[in-house]
From Swiss-Prot:
One of its GO terms (cellular component) is cytosol. Mg(2+) binds at T16, D50, E110. This is ATP-dependent dethiobiotin synthetase BioD. GO terms for molecular function: ATP binding; dethiobiotin synthase activity; magnesium ion binding. GO terms for biological process: biotin biosynthetic process. The lineage of its organism: Bacteria, Pseudomonadati, Pseudomonadota, Gammaproteobacteria, Legionellales. SUPFAM superfamilies: P-loop containing nucleoside triphosphate hydrolases. Its cofactor is Mg(2+). Keywords: ATP-binding, Biotin biosynthesis, Cytoplasm, Ligase, Magnesium, Metal-binding, Nucleotide-binding. The active site is at K33. It catalyses: (7R,8S)-7,8-diammoniononanoate + CO2 + ATP = (4R,5S)-dethiobiotin + ADP + phosphate + 3 H(+). It is found in: Cytoplasm. It comes from the Bacteria.
Amino acid sequence: MKRYFVTGTDTDCGKTFVTNQLVNYFSNSAAIKPIASGCEYSENQLVNSDALLHQQQNHLSLEIINPWRFRLPVSPHLSAREDGASIDVHKVADYCLNLQLNDIKKLFIEGAGGLMVPLNEQDTWLDFLKLTRIPVILVVGMKLGCINHTLLTQEVLEINKIKCQGWIANCLDQDMLMLDENINTLEAKLKYPLLARTNYGGKISDICLSSL
């Protein structure tokens, strides 16, 4: 089973939407979101709205999709602390590397927030990637400032020798000024391919998804 880690340029860049689009596109694929904050109680258990969306796609249990759940809608390390818990990055890494799902050929692992979001007082998603070496798919939320955020993310990945499979342009605003020019700029400056583009509220448009 191939595994990919889906991270983004920022919170609310559209990782969940794009991840679900990838699951729709590829047969025999599934998605999980191992860590989520901002969960609410439903039927005596904490539930995350993003995990519920993945469940609708996957028909997997929430326990498989989202084993680490916390209440407050803040950074995972703070939300876990408020719940009297802590996140062990080694356990998260082991879970994502060893999870086996029948008939699933591609597993998309959605992170919480961006690459440098703290999971505890020492570790970030970058440390998770150093442990797992799972290749990254970068979701770029197309908005003002995305070029800077994207190039900074690329630099961190490069310095730490983390493989990036490619990036996806997620068009958040149908009225964004010079949208195509921004995408062209990123294509020229990034060292990995544009895999796909999602137009505002629309389906994913394949550009280079066959490389996954």
